[in-house]
A protein has these predicted regions:
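Short coil turns that delineate tetratricopeptide repeat
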Residues: 35, 67-69, 101, 135, ...
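Register position in tetratricopeptide repeats
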Residues: 16-17, 50, 82-83, 116-117, ...
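Canonical positions in the second alpha-helix
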Residues: 29-30, 63-64, 95-96, 129-130, ...
Length: 173
């Protein structure tokens, strides 16, 4: 997912729940001294996300006023997607894409949101834009394929499936 989700603290990848919880406590200590530090807020939010505490993660990010960093906006969208708030996530992803229309991860997440909202034609359109940037993006190709199936566009769906198979994706689709 987003680069924030692979955060490393003190050069150590945080995988164990206890390590993550200890890191959150350290972030809390830092936030007492500097409550507006975006990097600390984002770090804590990411770790809460990693623990599956999505509401807390979102509340943490909501402490940042006037978010301008598109990576943070995208992170917020990912959290909203985890909370199944696809409409609001889509709005944020569109904000990201206004700033950087070639942001492949935002385009991918947008196809995910649109699919969940059953806006299949828009999934295909967004996928086509994204595939001009990264023609072999498997997750986007899968979303395009599934949307074409939903739209009963069998011939076009089969072309996408063939491409996925050529890319070596072992799929039962």
């Amino acid at each position: 997912m987003n680069s924030y989700l692979n955060i490393k603290i003190n050069g150590k990848n945080l995988e164990k729940k206890a390590d993550i919880e200890n890191a959150i406590l350290k972030f809390d200590e830092d936030l007492k001294e500097n409550p507006d530090d975006e990097a600390t807020i984002v770090g804590k939010s990411v770790l809460l996300y990693k623990l599956g505490k999505l509401n807390e993660s979102l509340n943490c990010l909501n402490q940042i006023e006037n978010i301008r960093n598109v990576s943070i906006i995208e992170l917020k969208a990912v959290i909203l997607m985890g909370l199944e708030n696809y409409k609001q996530a889509l709005e944020l992803l569109n904000e990201v894409l206004k700033v950087d229309n070639g942001n492949i991860s935002a385009l991918y997440y947008k196809t995910e949101c649109l699919f969940q909202l059953k806006r299949f034609n828009e999934v295909v359109d967004t996928a086509n834009v994204a595939l001009k940037i990264d023609k072999n993006h498997q997750s986007i190709l899968i979303n395009k394929f599934c949307s074409l199936v939903e739209l009963n566009s069998t011939k076009e769906a089969l072309k996408v499936k063939e491409k996925l198979l050529r890319l070596g994706l072992n799929c039962n689709i």
